[in-house]
Each structure stands twice: as structure tokens, then as C-alpha cells.
Amino acid sequence: QEHSSAASDVYKRQLQMRCSEVFGIDIHPGARIGKGIMIDHAHSIVIGETAVVGDNVSMLHSVTLGGTGKDDEIRHPNIGDGVLLGAGAKVLGNISVGSCSRVAAGSVVLQNVPEKTTVAGVPAKVVGAAGCTNPSISMDQIIKRK
């Protein structure tokens, strides 16, 4: 059993290195990724070691799920189910993005995001409702004011 776990760890590291080399993507082998993730224009994606990505999440190019250097154990964000992460979005630190929310392109998220909301800006602030039941599937990026 230990041998298969060690072999699995080696395989994960090799896969990480190959993806980084070919696509410019760095997904740490320790990150937990849900089913149905969609990475559109798979380039310049960074997902840190303690990040958790829920089911049916869509992320566009240049998304970072990274740390801030301030946390010891859980350093990366928890992304809920059905979230849409716009191009260039940076979600940093031990924070949560609630299910069925949207993070606008170019936003820097440093605080928790409630479910079914849209955040935008640097730093990101709530700018409206998510506007649909499943942003990651509809890929709707129009801001709907509350």
C-alpha cells in the first residue's frame, strides 16, 4: 500500500512538471480538484498546494489560486461548486469563494465571497448578484446589479 502511494506521488509530480512545461500551468499535486473543472484557454494557471476547487468550476486563462505568505497550514483558497473565475483573476490566501459565484476578470480577491454573488476590482468587492443559477456552466460574465 505504501509503495502504491509513493508511486502515485511520483506520478503526480511528473504530471505537474509536464503540464507546467507544455501549457504553462502549475497545479500542485496536493491541491484538491473537484469533478467537471473546465480550464478555458489553459495557460498561466496556478493552483497552490492547499487549494480546494469544487465541482463544475470554470476558470479562464491566467487564474491564480495562491497564498499570501501570511498563513501557516491552509495557505490557499477554497472555491465552491459552480464558480466562474474570470481571466486573470487572483484569489489569494485562506479564504472561500461561495458556490455559484463569479469573480470578474482581473480581480484580486483577498476576502471571503458569499454564495451567488459577483465580485470585481482590486481589491475585489461585491458588485452584484451572480445573475444566474450556475455561472460556471452559462459562462455569463455580465454584471447584474443587486
Q: What residue spans do the PLM features occupy?
A:
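Acidic/histidine-enriched, glycine/proline-rich intrinsically disordered or flexible terminal extensions
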Residues: P135-K146
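Conserved beta-strand-loop-alpha-helix hinge in the C-terminal portion
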Residues: E115-I137
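Intrinsic disorder/low-complexity segments
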Residues: Q1, V83, T133-P135
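Single conserved hydrophobic/aromatic residue that forms the stacking wall/gate
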Residues: Q1-A7, Y11
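Left-handed beta-helix
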Residues: F23, P29, G34-K35, D40-E49, ...
